[in-house]
Amino acid sequence: MTQEDRRTALASLAGIGLLVAGCAKHDVARKGGDDDAVTANEDLMREHGVLRRILIVYREVAPKLLTNAAAVDAAAIAVATTLFQTFGERYHEQMLEEQHIFPIVRKAGGEAAGLIDALLAQHARGREITSYVLDRTKSGRVGTGDAQPLARTLTAFARMYEPHAAREDTIIFPAFKKAVGPKGYDELGDQFEDIERRTFGGDGFDMAIDKVADIERRLGLADLSAFTAPAVA
């Protein structure tokens, strides 16, 4: 293992440690009563909501990299990408979708099953992109020669993941729920929650929401009203 590989591995492990530490503050059961119950698909889709907020970060910083890369908080991009890697790729994609949901949907057949290969290919491409982004931002600054390819890559990643998550929300997850039936759906929902708590040491969703909100504040993206479309001329 090269010195560069060691630094990358240590940074990744540090990211996981931060996520677990953050979860310790949110270790409160989500199923304290019927009103607090979270179904499997609701949980999956709100996890997508966290990841979509990271995509917004990517979309917003990309043009800024092209105009003044030195002014961009590259460390905040690295934190956002680490969150996508730990919460999105290693937990949501690998532990839930790839180990449980996709095999069930593929076995059930139909339209949803026909999407699985493309979704898996996009997961793999996303992980390649995540490694690239971390490599270009881990120093806390973006080099002049890296600004344009990084901006292009962030935009391409967001473009890929938006339809990816939308298909999962509207086709894959409903097919999964139908395939397992009411009893299996409830049991898998409990299993997914157990996986989340074992992985993060607490409520991973609450932790991720806190972290993404902090990233948005650092990058000046916390004001929702700033995204309101202008009036039609």
Predicted feature locations:
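Small-residue-biased structural context
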Residues: 1-233
